[in-house]
């Protein structure tokens, strides 16, 4: 086993004592230990120090978007500036992945471009670009939102590819889900030599989950 990955969801939202117990059970001698810390309010000095204590090497700080209007619309309880502050705090201690989502409700191509540009400016080791995935039972789907505008979705994904590759990121893994915008893929980008071991092993089916 080369890597440990805890997430999705936000395991850093657990009470500190409980998170300590979980990490202690997963503290193996591996090349890479990733924990998802999607919500910026969970990325506190106490949590970061605990992750470090248990050998975590990589975390995910997931803005989804850097547009505050969209964050409010999709029910997020934070502002983009909180994500930036949490990222800068985490970056001092860990490698970082950031997730972005194309085709969030009411977002334009320019809105998405802004988020991509902001992520590149922050310069995490990894940036993963998702297209919005609507589960059949999701609130957005039940409220009638449909993510079927293929042209805009393709433009968003194309922009992300151009911007990220120009900035020195290379696409290194890809996967597809049902009900995504434009039936497009989710793509992981990494700086040279910073590819996520877990993602590679899972995509190549070289390891068990």
Residue ranges and their predicted role:
Residues 1-160:
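Conserved non-cysteine loop/helix-boundary elements of the Radical SAM core domain that shape
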Residues 143-209:
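Auxiliary Fe-S-binding modules of radical SAM enzymes
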């Amino acid at each position: 086993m080369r890597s440990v990955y805890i997430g999705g969801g936000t395991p850093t939202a657990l009470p500190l004592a409980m998170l300590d117990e979980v990490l202690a059970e997963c503290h193996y001698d591996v090349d890479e230990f990733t924990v998802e810390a999607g919500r910026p309010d969970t990325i506190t000095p106490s949590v970061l120090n605990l992750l470090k204590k248990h050998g975590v090497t990589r975390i995910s700080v997931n803005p989804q978007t850097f547009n505050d209007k969209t964050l409010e619309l999709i029910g997020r309880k934070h502002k983009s500036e909180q994500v930036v502050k949490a990222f800068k705090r985490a970056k001092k201690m860990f490698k970082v992945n950031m997730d972005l989502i194309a085709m969030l409700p009411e977002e334009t191509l320019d809105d998405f471009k802004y988020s991509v540009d902001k992520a590149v400016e922050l310069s995490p080791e990894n940036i993963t670009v998702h297209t919005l995935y609507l589960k059949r039972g999701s609130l957005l789907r039940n409220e009638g939102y449909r993510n079927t505008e293929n042209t805009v979705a393709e433009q968003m994904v194309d922009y992300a590819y151009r911007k990220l590759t120009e900035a020195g990121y290379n696409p290194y893994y890809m996967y597809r889900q049902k009900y995504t915008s434009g039936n497009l893929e989710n793509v992981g980008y990494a700086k040279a030599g910073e590819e996520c071991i877990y993602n590679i092993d899972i995509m190549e089916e070289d390891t068990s989950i």
